[in-house]
Amino acid sequence: MKKIAVLTSGGDAPGMNAAVRAVVRSGIYNEMKVMGVKQGYNGLINAQIEEMNLSSVADIIHRGGTILRTARSEEFMTEEGQRKALNVIKVLGIEGIVAIGGDGSIRGAKTLNELGIPTIGVPGTIDNDLAYTDYTIGFDTSVNTVVDAISKIRDTSTSHGRANIIEVMGRHCGDIALMAGLAGGAESIIVPEVGVDVDEVCNKLLKGRYRGKLHSIIILAEGAGSAIEMSKEIEEKTGIETRATILGHLQRGGSPTASDRILASKLGARAVELLLQDIGNRVVGVHGKNVIDMDIDEALSMKSNFDIETYELTKILSI
């Protein structure tokens, strides 16, 4: 291959820029032309595509968000949208594509492969909800953002003797809540994989108060309930003043951690290596310390295994 393209799609994640940088620099190193697609799959449909060079990706490894911008494309899910995208790809002579994003983006990459365009999927989502890889780009940064928020909220919670419920992202996957709760020393962690027992949470809060605890931190994944509604219920049942904090899109922003920059750089470079060999229909990821790649269909068919051992550990450490 001599001409490839890179896009970022779906929700943004810290480290996407580092992945784009790795794709562009690895491609140019191997004498490829690298095109940047703006606004995700919409950019393929609307021909929002421009050639990138070394200057295009200078000073971006430390930046959050994505310089290519991103979007969720309903049109690309239609046959007409796919026809338009395929026409643009052929007119521009693009031979392969690197798609960076979450589950929907990986499914978009699968569609491109089915249309005859070799495409590699790179996992970029703070939710860490792609089963085939241990970690996704952006997850580590998001966890660190939440841990920082926990520390700040604990300060004011202690001063006022309150309980605080901190709602974090994770509709179907509780990894952010789990790991941030462990690292932040939360008293209770509520995730969609396990569900919620409000009475159990209340009993733990009351036991802590009996021992003289001045604060209580509860981490709630958004898919397991509403922090606002739960705070009202807990306050009614315990008599402890309970406040809710919804971190929202704060978790998607900020400079990526060293771990996310390293992961993104390795995965972006591996994606280019595969395209150099005219290999498509693959995703890249990480198992332990090893960068891996596998068939997209196999990757998408895998079911996430919740880390129940770590969850049980948090219950032991939060007594």
Curated annotation (Swiss-Prot):
Signal peptide, first to last residue: none
**Activity-regulation annotation:** Allosterically activated by ADP and other diphosphonucleosides, and allosterically inhibited by phosphoenolpyruvate.
User: What keywords are assigned to this protein?
Assistant: Allosteric enzyme, ATP-binding, Cytoplasm, Glycolysis, Kinase, Magnesium, Metal-binding, Nucleotide-binding, Transferase
Instruction: Identify the catalytic residues.
Output: D127
* Residues the entry annotates as binding ATP: G11, R72, S73, G102, D103, G104, S105
Where is it predominantly found? cytoplasm
Compartments where found: Cytoplasm
Where do the annotations place ADP binding? R21, A22, V23, V24, R25, R154, G185, A186, E187, R211, K213, L214, H215
One GO CC term on file: 6-phosphofructokinase complex
Instruction: Describe the family membership recorded for this protein in Swiss-Prot or TrEMBL.
Output: Belongs to the phosphofructokinase type A (PFKA) family. ATP-dependent PFK group I subfamily. Prokaryotic clade 'B1' sub-subfamily.
The name on file for this protein is ATP-dependent 6-phosphofructokinase
UniProt gene name: pfkA
